[in-house]
Amino acid sequence: MSVFLRKQCLCLGFLLLHLLNQVSATLRCPSRCPSQCPSISPTCAPGVRSVLDGCSCCPVCARQRGESCSEMRPCDQSSGLYCDRSADPNNETGICMVPEGDNCVFDGVIYRNGEKFEPNCQYHCTCRDGQIGCVPRCQLDVLLPGPDCPAPKKVAVPGECCEKWTCGSEEKGTLGGLALPAYRPEATVGVELSDSSINCIEQTTEWSACSKSCGMGLSTRVTNRNLQCEMVKQTRLCMVRPCEQEPGEATDMKGKKCLRTKKSLKSIHLQFKNCTSLYTYKPRFCGICSDGRCCTPFNTKTIQVEFQCLPGQIIKKPVMVIGTCTCHSNCPQNNEAFLQELELKTSRGEM
């Protein structure tokens, strides 16, 4: 082999090694998230959700069944998928698969694990390992009674699937004046049977944004997860971040434009009104952005916290616990009227 061919083969070998390293780097989480994600959200196929990558850095399109997956390209967990990396010796890439599970029985019909179906025009359901999850196709909004509409109710409209709000034939007011904001339904909602002869499809909305950008606020949702299968409003305490800046917070940025999630430097007692938590906690808070973007909770859960309000009086309240936060440009608009209404109803004992 000539010297020229040897040099050419050597160059091609280095180029191939470089490309392999580049591809491998895109599969694993970087040591530090990029300072700014693409300004345009990823364009996903119809029915495919946009989710944070496995590194909680930037939004990506969730990978579907049979597609390749990695840390940077997570599978659609809302569809019950997981990334099977058993075929990769480096445990970096895999294929989105559905775990083997039990069949489901709904209204006398047997559905296979992973099978999707529509029991009626109002719900889109999926069988997942013996459990049925359904997503409402109709809007799950709630219209509260008010001066313009003291007795709102939903009625069926001929020729349409979804019911609509009405105040009755004698009402003159307009609809929607005191309606809660349109809630996004949870990715999956379960089906619980309160009676062997009645199918109750559970409907639960996502928690609303916290009523305060700093300090203790309130968050609400609507659910029918009860024995009566009736829609009721639930409220929890929430704190996105403390109003006072902790020492060292300004220096934690280290040149970055956004600090997504930060943990309290010391154990603190949670407080609301004249009540103080019995135990101390080290909660996570959402950080701040220096480029005008907003930083809000992305993944949360709810825990029961014991508070002491008066000597000898102990009560339990649901409290939001932040898992991760995300920075974005879709900042909440000014909705002071709704927040004041929420605070007023809570002070009346509706919490």
UniProtKB/Swiss-Prot annotation:
Expression sites (tissue/organ): Widely expressed. Highly expressed in neurons of dorsal root ganglia and dorsal horn of the spinal cord (at protein level). Expressed in astrocytes (at protein level). In cartilage, dominantly expressed in the chondrocyte territorial matrix.
Induction: During persistent inflammatory pain the expression levels are down-regulated.
Ranges of residues in domain VWFC: 102-168
One GO term describing the cellular component: cytoplasm
Main location class: secreted
Domain CTCK: 258-332
Organism: Rattus norvegicus
PANTHER family: CCN FAMILY MEMBER 3 (PTHR11348:SF8), CONNECTIVE TISSUE GROWTH FACTOR-RELATED (PTHR11348)
UniProt keywords, alphabetically: Cell junction, Cytoplasm, Disulfide bond, Gap junction, Glycoprotein, Growth factor, Hormone, Lipoprotein, Palmitate, Secreted, Signal
Residue ranges occupied by any TSP type-1 domain in the UniProt entry: 199-244
Cited function: Immediate-early protein playing a role in various cellular processes including proliferation, adhesion, migration, differentiation and survival. Acts by binding to integrins or membrane receptors such as NOTCH1. Essential regulator of hematopoietic stem and progenitor cell function. Inhibits myogenic differentiation through the activation of Notch-signaling pathway. Inhibits vascular smooth muscle cells proliferation by increasing expression of cell-cycle regulators such as CDKN2B or CDKN1A independently of TGFB1 signaling.
Entry protein name: CCN family member 3
Post-translational modification: May be palmitoylated on Cys-238, which is important for extracellular secretion.
Domain spans labelled IGFBP N-terminal: 25-99
Gene Ontology MF annotations: growth factor activity; heparin binding; hormone activity; integrin binding; Notch binding
Family: Belongs to the CCN family.
Cysteine disulfide links: C29-C55, C33-C57, C37-C58, C44-C61, C69-C83, C75-C96, C258-C295, C275-C309, C286-C325, C289-C327, C294-C331
Gene label: Ccn3
Cell compartments where the protein resides: Secreted; Cytoplasm; Cell junction, Gap junction
Pfam family, one: TSP1_CCN
Covalent lipid adducts (S-palmitoyl cysteine), residues: C238
Signal peptide positions on this chain: 1-21
Record: glycosylation sites: N91, N274
InterPro entries associated with the record: CCN (IPR050941), Cys_knot_C (IPR006207), Glyco_hormone_CN (IPR006208), Growth_fac_rcpt_cys_sf (IPR009030), IGFBP-like (IPR000867), IGFBP_CNN (IPR012395), Insulin_GF-bd_Cys-rich_CS (IPR017891), TSP1_CCN (IPR043973)
